[in-house]
Amino acid sequence: MEEGERWIVVPTWRVPGRMEKWHSLVKYLKHRTKDLEGVCYVPHHKVGWAWWTCSRVIFPLQGNSHLEIQAYWNLTPEKGWLSSYAVRITWYTERFWTDVTPDCADSLIHSTYFSCFTAGEVRRAIRGEKLLSCCNYPQAHRSKVPLLQFLALVVVQQNGRPQKNSTTRKRWRSNYWRGFRLARKDGRGHKQRGSEPPASGAYFPGVAKVLEILA
C-alpha cells in the first residue's frame, strides 16, 4: 500500500514584509548594545535541513527554559520564490513546550532582558513619591508583567509588617492602602507611571510591532 503525503500543521503569524527589520534589530541589540548578548541568532544558511526556515532566534530564559522565534519563507511557491513570510513563536521548558502569542512572548523576554524599573523606583512607589524613570519595554506590561505598584506591595509584604501600636505601623498602613488604590486604578488601563528620563538600556517596541504581525 502506497503511503500518502503527511502534513505537519503548526500555528504561525503572518508577516507582511521581509524579515530584514527583525534580523537587523536582533543583531544590533546582540552585538552593539549587548541587551540581547545571550540570544542565539541562527541565519538560514546555518539552519540545515529545514530549508523552509528563514531564521531562528533563541532567547534563553530563567529556569532552564527558552523562547524560539522561527521565521518561515517560501510559504506560497506557486506565486513566486520567497513570496510570503510567517513566524512561529514557541516556548520550551524542561517538561513541555507550547506555542505562544506575541504578547506572551513579550512578557517572557522582558522577564530576562531589557531594563525595567530599578529598586530605587520601587522604594519611591512605596513612599508614594514621583517616579524618575520608565520601562524600556512597555509593550510587555500589557500582558503578564506586574505593574510597578503591585511589585512595591510585594516588597512590603516580603519585608514583613511593623510591630503593633507604633508610628511606623500606622505609616505602613497608610502607605499600603494608598499603594493598593494606585494599583487598582492603574490596573484598569494597563498604563505605566513614570516621567521623562528612561532607564538605561535599549528600547524594544515589542515582537508584534517589530514584525508587523497580522493576526
Curated annotation (Swiss-Prot):
Misc note: Required for replication in 'nonpermissive' cells, including primary T-cells, macrophages and certain T-cell lines, but is dispensable for replication in 'permissive' cell lines, such as 293T cells. In nonpermissive cells, Vif-defective viruses can produce virions, but they fail to complete reverse transcription and cannot successfully infect new cells.
Source organism of this protein record: Human immunodeficiency virus type 2 subtype A (isolate KR) (HIV-2)
Modified sites of kind Phosphothreonine: 98
UniProt KW keywords: AIDS, Host cell membrane, Host cytoplasm, Host membrane, Host-virus interaction, Membrane, Phosphoprotein, Ubl conjugation, Ubl conjugation pathway, Virion
Protein name per UniProt: Virion infectivity factor
GO CC, any one term: membrane
Modifications the protein undergoes after translation, according to the UniProt entry: Processed in virion by the viral protease. Highly phosphorylated on serine and threonine residues.
Membrane topology: Peripheral membrane protein
Motif (BC-box-like motif): 147-156
Glycoprotein recorded as keyword: no
Purpose: Counteracts the innate antiviral activity of APOBEC3G. Forms a complex with host APOBEC3G thus preventing the entry of this lethally hypermutating enzyme into progeny virions. Functions as an adapter molecule, recruiting APOBEC3G to the ubiquitin-proteasome machinery. Targets APOBEC3G for degradation through the assembly with elongin BC complex, CUL5 and RBX1. Binds viral RNA and affects the stability of viral nucleoprotein core. May play a role in viral morphology.
Induction of expression: Expressed late during infection in a Rev-dependent manner.
Annotated region described as Multimerization, given as residue ranges: 154-167
Domain notes: The BC-like-box motif mediates the interaction with elongin BC complex. The HCCH motif (H-x(5)-C-x(18)-C-x(5)-H) mediates the interaction with CUL5.
Subunit organization: Homomultimer; in vitro and presumably in vivo. Interacts with viral Pr55Gag precursor and human APOBEC3G. The interaction between Vif and APOBEC3G is species-specific, which may play a role in restricting the replication of HIV to humans. Forms an E3 ligase complex by interacting with human CUL5 and elongin BC complex (ELOB and ELOC).
Compartment(s) where it occurs, according to its Swiss-Prot or TrEMBL record: Host cytoplasm; Host cell membrane; Virion
Family affiliation: Belongs to the primate lentivirus group Vif protein family.
Motif annotated as HCCH motif, chain positions: 110-141
UniProt GO BP: viral life cycle
Major location (coarse): host cell
